[in-house]
Curated annotation (Swiss-Prot):
The keyword Transferase does not apply. SUPFAM superfamilies: Isocitrate/Isopropylmalate dehydrogenase-like. It is an enzyme of class 1 (oxidoreductase). GO terms for biological process: L-leucine biosynthetic process. The gene is LEU2. Its main location: cytoplasm. Homodimer. Substrate binds at R92, R102, R131, D220. It catalyses: (2R,3S)-3-isopropylmalate + NAD(+) = 4-methyl-2-oxopentanoate + CO2 + NADH. Binds 1 Mg(2+) or Mn(2+) ion per subunit. The record marks Y138, K187 as: Important for catalysis. NCBIfam families: leuB. This is 3-isopropylmalate dehydrogenase.
Amino acid sequence: MSKNIVVLPGDHVGTEITNEAIKVLNAISEARPSIKFNFEHHLIGGAAIDATGVPLPDEASKKADAVLLGAVGGPKWGTGSVRPEQGLLKIRKELGLYANLRPCNFASDSLLDLSPLKPEYAKGTDFVVVRELVGGIYFGERKEDEGDGVAWDSEKYSVPEVQRITRMAAFLALQHNPPLPIWSLDKANVLASSRLWRKTVEETIKNEFPQLTVQHQLIDSAAMILVKSPTKLNGIVITNNMFGDIISDEASVIPGSLGLLPSASLASLPDTNKAFGLYEPCHGSAPDLPANKVNPIATILSAAMMLKLSLDLVEEGRAVEEAVRKVLDSGIRTGDLGGSNSTTEVGDAVAKAVKEILA
């Protein structure tokens, strides 16, 4: 069994964290020789701008089973007309990666004390933010300030776009027994696009998934619930592109470090565990961080999501998650988690644990 993975390290810590994820994937191959991973590296972000003048060269492969991304951006490239982040927007749009999945939970309960929330409020937090990724205000019509002191952006959604992301949320909810509740976040009291969103989500669940429940929350009240009692949102949280961008970042601090949280961006339902997807940590490129200090766990867990959702290697993906728990519980941690271990030491420990679990 051979799997083709495009690796886009990106900028700054991107190379370090993708190297550790590759190390863990290679450990799977060592434990299970029938599983082979072929890695093809390409540039993205600032590294691509420096080398080619554009943030995502056209030769980046679209024929892989999945894409593993490190991180893009940094102060060197600023906010000019050519920016590293444009590479991310381009690859999402070109590859049709319409659904961004960001789990919010604790990789280990031993990390509860690191949360900014009191342990009694944070314990048990377990939800997935499902963010619509290729529509809305980030891709709408806009006007820059051309000297007249006026600029604007437009938010546009269609019924098919909202139906598609709703079906993704419903699919994920139905993977559990009993099915998970769905929370839909919008601003329907103000925005026309949110009123269409709410109506379409409601009708899609009612007509296609009557066994599921959906509750609607205004995005501002959901933001308050998230810091006051995050377990109330346990289940599947579905929202549009901009709201999802913001609320998932808010959620990411609950487990105590951005270095822990993975993400997946999918082009189709993972109903056969073979959806094409791009996998990346939730954190940025950390340009100020010294070498070998970044936490690789988020990228390693992103690789675990890739194994389960795109590569049809569910058992191996769960083994990676279990290995991460064991390593964290053993006290092997980077500085962001109060430890003193290096990036490579954490990666080595997870790779070793994976081989032991799969032996």
